């Protein structure tokens, strides 16, 4: 049975370059809530590190997989579990997931998501007439599923897709 656990509460956000003091935040969150709205274009473009602990979900059936689901992280993200990189993602507007089963341990686990809204040559657009908000501006979930489950690895999709293939006779 699929279980979705919200991880939106209890995050610590720190800035490795020291631009701001560490703070406790609830998702969704952006560090540009104020400076991104002042109209002068000089908002903070940096890397923020979100971290929190979680307990590995127990699947009622034997086996099972655990995924972390990030609903949006602007603009580059690196997800780590217990210090090991689980996945990276470029592009701040889409859902992404990572199977973290083998990185989890019984008891407390540390989830860290490094997010950057810095100007990156590999990311389009590099500049625009809007603010490139930095942060986890949608939620983060754990998804626990049994071994037999719909695909959760395909581009953050819902796990099932139907594609009609019309034929010449209209069928």
What are these regions (language model features)?
Residues 3-5, 12-17, 40-41, 45-159:
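Accessory beta-strand-rich segments of carbohydrate-active enzymes
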Residues 11, 18-32:
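Extracellular glycan-recognition surfaces and repeat-rich motifs
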Residues 164-171:
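Contiguous beta-strand segments within globular domains
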């Amino acid at each position: 049975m699929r279980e979705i656990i919200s991880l939106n509460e209890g995050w610590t956000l720190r800035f490795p370059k020291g631009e701001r003091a560490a703070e406790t935040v609830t998702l969704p969150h952006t560090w540009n809530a104020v400076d991104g709205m002042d109209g002068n274009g000089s908002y903070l473009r940096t890397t923020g590190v979100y971290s929190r602990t979680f307990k590995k979900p127990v699947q009622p059936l034997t086996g099972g997989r655990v995924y972390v689901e990030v609903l949006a992280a602007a603009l580059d993200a690196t997800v780590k579990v217990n210090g090991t990189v689980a996945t990276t993602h470029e592009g701040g507007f889409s859902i992404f997931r990572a199977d973290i089963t083998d990185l989890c341990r019984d008891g407390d686990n540390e989830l860290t998501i490094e997010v950057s809204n810095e100007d990156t040559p590999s990311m389009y657009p590099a500049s625009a007439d809007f603010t490139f908000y930095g942060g986890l501006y949608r939620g983060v979930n754990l998804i626990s599923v049994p071994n037999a489950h719909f695909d959760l690895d395909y581009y953050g999709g819902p796990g099932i897709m139907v594609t009609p293939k019309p034929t010449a006779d209209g069928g």
